[in-house]
């Protein structure tokens, strides 16, 4: 009996983004290559579970080692290969497994892989320009994921919980989690591994203290972690682009008139509600992220669309420089070949 091993290497990119970009005294930029996952039994001993390993510097492939009898869910059309198994016939792949993220109005299809023995599989990103990253949940912190389509794969153990919230479809659950800045999001909690797909390159920003803050475009945030509901509420806030002017020159009669004060409070409350709703519906707003926490940032690289001219392309007629000579009575006359066509 012989076994063949497969090695896949991705060449290093010619252009490398400097590691000091976005780095500071308290802001740390790290790659996402710590990929071994372990859980702890009740007796304190470690047991190896499903392992995710990213391949390459800007990984578009992930090698996943699946333990026996532990289901692995992979987004449809993302499985590249299944290999390194004693018996591939013992690996069951269910292609009709639908996993509905209904609170976000997104219907996603996942393939379910489960085997009686350990096997490996390769999973690819959605696009060649995207980058894969691994979230390892150990039960101490939860993660917020903004886009349900960014989830590529996850292990189906009972300790891992994935919940999706939408403002208009399950308002009370959405408001109870305190992350009111985001219109829809997913909450990952428990223990397990989740493979995410980021647009462009993905970097991990470490905000080490409460004083560390960073302003990001909202759609560039792939995921961020937190301890509890209150922590998530304070994690992300809208960035105010203008400061409200304090009207010190208001007439004293306004302060003394309770009806006008109540009216102004109602107007301010209405304006704040409309502004919050406008920010929630918009995708180009900037938000302020406060530490301490880890933020996954995606560069959102998009290929420029090919532009074609609106007018019809036409070629200029080529000039004819071909001539012929005619000898008549000792004289030589040169004429262009177009004269032959005119005679016809």
UniProtKB/Swiss-Prot annotation:
**Which residues make up the transit peptide?**
1-13
Keyword NADP listed? The answer is: no
Gene3D superfamilies tied to this protein: Mitochondrial biogenesis AIM24
Cross-referenced SUPFAM superfamilies = TRAP-like
What does the UniProt entry say about where the protein is found? Mitochondrion
Q: Mind telling me which residue stretches traverse the membrane in this protein?
A: none
Would you kindly state one Gene Ontology biological process term found in this protein's UniProt entry? inner mitochondrial membrane organization
Kindly give the Pfam families that the UniProt entry links to this protein.
Answer: AIM24
Q: Which domain of life is it from?
A: Eukaryota
This protein's GO cellular component annotations are:
mitochondrial inner membrane
What InterPro entries does the database record attribute to this sequence? Answer: AIM24, AIM24_sf, Trp_RNA-bd_attenuator-like_dom
Q: Which UniProt keywords apply?
A: Mitochondrion, Transit peptide
Q: Which family does the similarity line name?
A: Belongs to the AIM24 family.
The protein here is known as Altered inheritance of mitochondria protein 24, mitochondrial
Starting at the broadest rank, the lineage of the source organism is: Eukaryota, Fungi, Dikarya, Ascomycota, Saccharomycotina
């Amino acid at each position: 009996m012989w076994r063949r091993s497969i090695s896949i290497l991705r060449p290093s990119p010619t252009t490398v983004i400097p590691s000091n970009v976005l780095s500071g005294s308290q802001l740390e930029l790290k790659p996402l290559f710590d990929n071994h996952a372990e859980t702890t039994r009740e007796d304190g001993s470690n047991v190896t579970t499903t392992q995710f390993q990213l391949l390459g510097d800007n990984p578009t492939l992930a090698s996943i080692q699946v333990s026996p009898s532990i289901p692995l869910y992979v987004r449809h059309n993302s499985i590249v290969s299944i290999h390194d198994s004693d018996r591939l016939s013992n690996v069951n792949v269910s292609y009709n497994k639908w996993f509905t993220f209904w609170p976000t109005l997104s219907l996603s299809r996942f393939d379910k892989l489960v085997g009686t023995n350990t096997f490996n599989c390769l999973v690819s990103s959605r696009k060649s320009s995207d980058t894969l990253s691994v979230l390892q949940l150990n039960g101490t912190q939860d993660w917020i994921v903004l886009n349900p389509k960014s989830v590529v794969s996850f292990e189906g153990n009972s300790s891992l919980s994935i919940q999706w919230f939408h403002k208009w479809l399950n308002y009370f659950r959405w408001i109870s989690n305190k992350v009111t800045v985001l219109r829809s999001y997913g909450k990952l909690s428990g223990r397990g591994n989740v493979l995410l797909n980021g647009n462009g390159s993905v970097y991990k920003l470490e905000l080490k203290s409460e004083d560390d803050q960073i302003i990001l475009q909202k759609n560039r945030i792939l995921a961020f972690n937190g301890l509890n509901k209150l922590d998530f509420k304070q994690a992300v806030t809208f960035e105010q682009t203008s400061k409200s002017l304090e009207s010190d020159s208001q007439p004293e009669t306004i302060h003394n008139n309770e009806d006008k004060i109540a009216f102004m409070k109602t107007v301010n409350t209405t304006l704040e509600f409309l502004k919050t709703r406008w920010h929630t519906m918009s995708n180009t707003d900037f938000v302020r992220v406060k530490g301490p926490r880890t933020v996954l940032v995606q560069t959102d690289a998009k290929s420029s669309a090919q532009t074609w001219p609106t007018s019809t392309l036409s070629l200029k007629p080529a000039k004819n420089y071909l001539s012929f000579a005619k000898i008549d009575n000792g004289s030589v006359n040169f004429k262009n070949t177009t004269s032959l066509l005119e005679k016809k």
